[in-house]
């Protein structure tokens, strides 16, 4: 039987594989607590619309008790409006990101993250 930490890491892996890389927004409802699902969709859907070929790669995934910390690199092509910027058609590559999640009963109940938005803007020619 998998430990609580392994089960919690599996939730984050599904978020990356099925939602962020796979574009399956229906999975958001399975992975997030009901009160957070709409909030998650509010940032995921527009991001995937702007960068439909998004690829997140998990570099590190660490779990302790009900918490999971993840380090990612993200790549994608800017084909839709993003942060008020018209599509450039340019790619960004290997942008560093980190996500932190609290998981209860197999669902994300709290999440927050940081990303290198300046580097993404620079690679897209927007800064």
Named regions from a protein language model:
Residues 1-127:
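C-terminal and inter-domain tail/linker signature
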């Amino acid at each position: 039987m998998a430990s609580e930490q392994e089960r919690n890491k599996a939730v984050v892996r599904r978020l990356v594989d099925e939602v962020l890389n796979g574009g399956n927004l229906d999975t958001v409802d399975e992975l997030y607590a009901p009160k957070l699902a709409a909030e998650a969709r509010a940032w995921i859907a527009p991001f995937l619309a702007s960068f439909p070929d998004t690829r997140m790669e998990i570099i590190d995934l660490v779990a302790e008790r009900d918490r999971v910390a993840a380090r990612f690199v993200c790549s994608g092509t800017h084909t839709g409006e993003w942060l008020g910027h018209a599509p450039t058609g340019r790619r960004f590559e290997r942008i560093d990101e980190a996500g932190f999640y609290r998981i209860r009963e197999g669902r994300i109940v709290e999440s927050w993250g940081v990303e290198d938005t300046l580097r993404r803007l620079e690679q897209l020619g927007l800064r």
